[in-house]
Regions:
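Beta-strand-rich interaction surfaces with strong enrichment in secreted/lumenal proteins
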Residues: 60-66, 75-79, 129-133, 142-146
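Extracellular ligand-binding interfaces
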Residues: 90-128
Length: 178
């Protein structure tokens, strides 16, 4: 309730309640394919694709028995990041028992406030996410703090690999921004 200057109450004028922490402003499960995301294939023949069996998006640079050079982006539609938000998603890496030492350089999450369809002309900022200790195909929860960069921001999952480097498959599902 609000008070008038003479101390009287004004009924019915309740202040706006803040958003509940559990309310997602954006979500995409990938259960039915790529959804509202798009892809950008910068290098290599491989690309992000929907996995109908595991209900996720996945990317691998493994082809014809070897790891090949790739750079591929999985990009969200515009998301309101006019204030800091929390990103959550599930991720899995394969094959089994591979090192995750270089994960933070190869399997990364980025945000941009000026992406307009070409990843090479946008300014991207990497956000820190958590990774499992080793690969093993099991989905685990990942989380990141997304900075306040504007009402028309884009989120991207970037997969990178060099020729001959040991590569992992990266699977992503149940993306949410809260």
């Amino acid at each position: 309730s609000l008070q008038t200057n003479d101390g009287g109450l004004i009924e019915g004028d309740e202040p706006e309640q803040p958003e509940e922490p559990g309310d997602a402003i954006f979500s995409e499960s990938f259960a039915n394919g790529i959804g509202s995301f798009t892809t950008a294939d910068i290098a290599g023949e491989q690309a992000w694709n929907a996995d109908d069996q595991y209900k996720c998006m996945k990317m691998s640079a493994y082809a014809d028995g070897t790891s090949v050079k790739n750079e591929d982006w999985l990009i969200s539609p515009a998301i309101d990041l006019s204030k800091a938000r929390t990103l959550t998603f599930e991720q899995a890496f394969g094959p089994y028992n591979k090192s995750m030492d270089n994960a933070s350089q190869l399997y990364t999450v980025w945000v941009s406030n000026n992406y307009s369809g070409d990843v090479s002309t946008a300014t991207w900022t990497q956000v820190t996410i958590n990774y499992p200790a080793e690969s093993g195909w099991a989905f685990s929860d990942a989380q990141a703090t997304l900075p306040a960069i504007g009402a028309q921001a884009h989120l991207a999952f970037k997969y990178k690999n060099a020729d001959g480097d040991e590569t992992l498959t990266w699977e992503i599902k149940n993306v949410a921004v809260k």
